[in-house]
Amino acid sequence: MPEKAEPAEGWPVVEGDYVVGDPEAPVHVVTLGSHIEEDILKAAGEDKVAIAGPCKTENIGIEKVIANVIANPNIRFGVLCGAEVTGHLTGQCFKAMYENGVDPDSGEIIGAEGAIPYLENIPEEAVERYRDQIVELVDLIDVEDVDEIVKAIEECVEKDPGAYEEGPMTISLEEEEEEELAEVAGMPVSAETVTVEYRINDVRVGVKSIGAMQRYMAGYLSGRTMGLLIGIISGMIFLFLPMVVLGGV
């Protein structure tokens, strides 16, 4: 029987929208935009799943999952399933995080395609701990068939290597936000709205850049024109001044 370990006191350590099974189970399940976690837990059995729940944002949502997983060394597998989240592309971002990690300077998930794929509230060490602790991340993105998901969970359980060699790693998120919705000016908005806002911002930046370039070119051309006129006048002065002086003598 695989060796087990004690999770962090009070595990799960971060509140969220999830169901908890057996803390000694080796699998955590991320249902992305679908709320099928209870069906999965019931079908698979609580002894096979440690924690399951949706994750709808590619930043704070992923951070919460990481925080709860690394606080329990018994979790060695992850299953990504359920509907992909439009705009956020949380599943793709989660997979990119596992495969590539994050930029150490900016916290950006390397290779992520979501709207705001930055893990800014957890240290890089937490991300690397997750990547090392999880021996396999099963990609069932856009799969909502409970039987297929349970089959993947059972295959993970059969390969359970036992608890991670290091003890629980606990972190506190620097910023708590609602996972389901982002907020703009205090008002909750959907993933699609967030994406549109960022696209509009990109357009604004582009327009400002074009305007700045136009002003620069106008000034540059105006300067060249003025310089050309000064050059012509100076040339005429130097050309005709000796003639005037000599003619006067």
From Swiss-Prot:
It is found in: Cell membrane. Pathway: One-carbon metabolism; methanogenesis from CO(2); methyl-coenzyme M from 5,10-methylene-5,6,7,8-tetrahydromethanopterin: step 2/2. The chain crosses the membrane at residues 226-246. Its cofactor is 5-hydroxybenzimidazolylcob(I)amide. It comes from the Archaea. Keywords: Cell membrane, Cobalt, Membrane, Methanogenesis, Methyltransferase, One-carbon metabolism, Transferase, Translocase, Transmembrane, Transmembrane helix. One of its GO terms (cellular component) is plasma membrane. 5-hydroxybenzimidazolylcob(I)amide binds at residue 88. Coiled coil: none annotated. One of its GO terms (biological process) is methanogenesis, from carbon dioxide. Residues 247-249 are extracellular. Residues 2-225 are cytoplasmic. Pfam families: MtrA. It catalyses: 5-methyl-5,6,7,8-tetrahydromethanopterin + coenzyme M + 2 Na(+)(in) = 5,6,7,8-tetrahydromethanopterin + methyl-coenzyme M + 2 Na(+)(out). The complex is composed of 8 subunits; MtrA, MtrB, MtrC, MtrD, MtrE, MtrF, MtrG and MtrH. Part of a complex that catalyzes the formation of methyl-coenzyme M and tetrahydromethanopterin from coenzyme M and methyl-tetrahydromethanopterin. This is an energy-conserving, sodium-ion translocating step. This is Tetrahydromethanopterin S-methyltransferase subunit A. It comes from Methanopyrus kandleri (strain AV19 / DSM 6324 / JCM 9639 / NBRC 100938). The gene is mtrA.
